[in-house]
Amino acid sequence: MSEYSLFTSESVSEGHPDKIADQISDAVLDAIIAQDKHARVAVETLVKTGVAIVAGEVTTSAWVDLEQIVRDVICDIGYTSSDVGFDGATCGVMNIIGKQSPDINQGVDRAKPEDQGAGDQGLMFGYASNETDVLMPAPITFSHQLVQRQAEARKSGLLPWLRPDAKSQVTCRYEGGKVVGIDAVVLSTQHNPEVSYNDLREGVMELIVKHVLPAELLSKDTQFHINPTGQFIIGGPVGDCGLTGRKIIVDSYGGMARHGGGAFSGKDPSKVDRSAAYAGRYVAKNIVAAGLAERCEIQVSYAIGVAQPTSISLNTFGTGKISDDKIIKLVREVFDLRPYAITTMLDLLHPMYQETAAYGHFGRAPQTKTVGEDTFSTFTWEKTDRADALRSAAGL
């Protein structure tokens, strides 16, 4: 649901340089948290031609083979040859990780876990709307689906000339706040030198675009821009330097909601940039699922070393069944938004994060996953298990 008549969002594939960096950072986090659930982790990655640099601050009892983790991520994405532009088996890997500052640590750790302070100050937003079945904005949902399908077609051999790097962009048309059509589609995908442009365009249109986008939203007036420069052979870290945390709008709501500015990947749950943004999505989604509003955006803010949020604000954009002030009161009753309580509520101390680092952190289906002897649910912030409590408390 949008106030705009047209709204555009973009996504990028797992082979985009910034997403390579995000996935490496979260793979390192997962490897550490699998051994030490109470580790403090803040890992940043830079990838460029022939090299991956991993830096940050980590305090943990775990030992992980960082170089092998980096190589595995790069190879699993599909960068396995210099012909593609990057080779995980032969690239350089530089490790410049240090320990977390004791000044930060003393503000976070407490004798009573529930009194754990926020790892930093900041503001975070959560959002949900009823315009798609996953309660996400349509433009970002469709954009993610396009690049997910690109990776699927590449890895399965359906379109064997595809390479890992790709970007998508979808413009949706709204009337009365509802999606009534798709105005424009952009899909740029890396490819090998042998495929002709006509074959590429036909393959992408038939097996990616039309496979993903609802036919009823496409028309003779929809604009399709498939590799509009005509050629996209050089991609990945050769084409562009990749950095962790540089796709925060792709990671969240595609610009439909506000963003506090903090990135997610490479950060353990004590960092409210990540955990409170997940909690914000959980709260907003349950509000919409409960029928309290058709659209909801929530803001929470924190001070470093302080457990209680410094503020909780909410906007239902005139779609609420009860007042926003009453919904905020219900949020305070039903959800505990202190950092440790968020970690417990969403069961965040598991190696669940690499999967979030491509194709969006929100609008994803929770799945049961086992790593070693640890069985847990992924994407727990997408559950709507508090909708009934909200509905009941609201008297609806």
Swiss-Prot record:
Keywords: ATP-binding, Cytoplasm, Magnesium, Metal-binding, Nucleotide-binding, One-carbon metabolism, Potassium, Transferase
Region (Flexible loop): 100-110
GO terms under cellular component: cytoplasm
Enzyme class, broadest EC rank: transferase
Disulfide bridges in this chain: none
Ligand binding (L-methionine): E57, Q100, D240, K271
GO molecular function: ATP binding; magnesium ion binding; methionine adenosyltransferase activity
Record localization: Cytoplasm
Source superkingdom: Bacteria
SUPFAM superfamilies: S-adenosylmethionine synthetase
Residue numbers binding ATP: H16, D165, A166, K167, D240, R246, K247, A263, K267
One Pfam family named in its UniProt record: S-AdoMet_synt_C
Keyword ATP-binding carried by entry: yes
EC number(s) stated in the UniProt entry for this protein: 2.5.1.6
Subunit relationships: Homotetramer; dimer of dimers.
Protein function: Catalyzes the formation of S-adenosylmethionine (AdoMet) from methionine and ATP. The overall synthetic reaction is composed of two sequential steps, AdoMet formation and the subsequent tripolyphosphate hydrolysis which occurs prior to release of AdoMet from the enzyme.
Family the UniProt entry places it in: Belongs to the AdoMet synthase family.
NCBIfam families per UniProt: metK (TIGR01034)
Protein name in the entry: S-adenosylmethionine synthase
Gene coding for it: metK
